[in-house]
């Protein structure tokens, strides 16, 4: 069995590593404000302009993940299904817009033909 002095040294070294290491990392790591101040002014301006949009995108992503997580299916299958339904909705919307444009063109042609 090792001597008491060696055991105490090892315990002190372990505590120093387990507590001192994360404390040192926390002390050395810059805050978000410090990082932001190190950006050049153009990047700061662009970051401030897009902050709201990025926050909205992140919030919608998180809510989407929460709804997919509530599903009985695997999250990957749920996301894939939602992507396919989104594609279908976009396709139907695009088709409806094209049909509306064609209908308006036909109406304009009809009005021009009647006016002549």
Curated annotation (Swiss-Prot):
InterPro entries found in the cross-reference section: Cbp4 (IPR012420)
Family from the record: Belongs to the CBP4 family.
Purpose of the protein: Essential for the assembly of ubiquinol-cytochrome c reductase. It has a direct effect on the correct occurrence of the Rieske protein, core 4, core 5 and apocytochrome b.
Ranges in a coiled coil: 79-116
Membrane-spanning residues: 11-27
Subcellular location, principal: mitochondrion
Assigned GO CC terms: mitochondrial inner membrane
Annotated membrane topology: Single-pass membrane protein
Keywords: Chaperone, Coiled coil, Membrane, Mitochondrion, Mitochondrion inner membrane, Transmembrane, Transmembrane helix
PANTHER family assigned: ASSEMBLY FACTOR CBP4
GO BP, one annotated term: mitochondrial respiratory chain complex III assembly
Region feature Disordered, mapped onto this chain: 76-116
Subcellular location: Mitochondrion inner membrane
Record's protein name: Assembly factor CBP4
